[in-house]
A protein has these predicted regions:
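Class I SAM-dependent methyltransferase Rossmann-like catalytic core
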Residues: 10-25
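Class I SAM-dependent methyltransferase "Motif I" SAM/SAH-binding loop
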Residues: 46-48
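Short conserved loop adjoining the S-adenosyl-L-methionine
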Residues: 92-98
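A short SAM/SAH-binding and catalytic strip from SAM-dependent methyltransferases
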Residues: 103-114
Length: 258
């Protein structure tokens, strides 16, 4: 179930798009679905109406489970027979044991998390792979909108005004990769997409990816951990600092025998 380290090519993404076209999924969800191996354990954090989970359960026979904050979304999922519970990805991932899933998915949700770094750590604690998709705030149209109008950008992939958007932690591709480096997470794959989910045709380097990609899908994994480093709900324990040597007792002169 190992994934290639290199980014998916535009040609490969086009094949995925054509093969999955017409299944009712968003394009980024179609790409995510293509990354999932059959008969694996999958958790979708912020699964909305359960479209991705239903597709994976139907076409790949996965053990599909989800967490959704919205009662309406939970009702839609349960009405389809999906194993979805109402919960908050910011806090409820901590209750899952280590290595509970093969894949943990966070699609267009990380920007709405209160503590994205802790969510990523927990994703890679409970899952073998983490798959994250998000909107790129460094896209050139967003930069131009802010420069020209002096207002928070709005575009196809950023449809809501600043005061009503759920995106409280917007980020760029460079921001996300930097965070992964800080957390010690391994980027197995990176796919750069336009707003409609098709491959970004102008992206050919990290700098161009950050400028011309409206959204991206990352596949993450964690470095191998020693059993002694596993802490449920926490990152790997850091080495303890050595304690300072005790101070020598003050010198006292011997008593005068006379």
């Amino acid at each position: 179930m190992a994934l290639p380290r290199s980014a998916v090519s535009a040609e490969a993404l086009a094949v995925v798009t054509n093969r999955l076209n017409g299944n009712g999924l968003r394009q980024d969800l179609r790409l995510i679905a293509a990354l999932i191996e059959p008969h694996t354990r999958v958790l979708d954090v912020g699964c909305a109406d359960g479209a991705l989970l239903a597709h994976l359960a139907r076409t790949k026979g996965v053990d599909a489970r989800g967490i959704e904050l919205s009662p309406t979304g939970v009702h839609e999922c349960v009405s389809q027979g999906l194993a979805v519970v109402q919960g908050d990805g910011d806090t409820d991932l901590a209750i899952y044991p280590d290595d509970s899933f093969d894949y943990v998915i966070l699609s267009q949700t990380i920007q709405a998390m209160r503590q994205p770094h802790l969510v990523l750590e927990n994703m890679l604690r409970i899952g073998r792979f983490g798959i994250v998709s998000f909107t790129n705030y460094a896209y050139w149209r967003a930069r131009w909108y802010l420069l020209r109008r002096g207002r928070m950008p709005m575009a196809r992939c950023l449809p809501d005004p600043w005061y009503s958007t759920a995106n409280i932690h917007p980020c760029t591709l460079e921001d996300f990769e930097h965070l992964c480096t800080e957390l010690g997470l391994r980027i197995e794959q990176r796919s750069c997409l336009s707003a409609d989910g098709t491959p970004s045709r102008l992206a050919s380097s990290r700098w161009l990816d950050n400028l011309f990609s409206e959204q991206a899908v990352f596949v993450l994994s964690r470095p191998a951990r020693r059993p002694a480093d596993r802490r449920s709900g926490r990152a790997a324990a850091r080495p303890a600092r050595p304690l300072p040597a005790p101070a020598a007792p003050p010198h006292r002169p011997a008593p005068d025998p006379s």
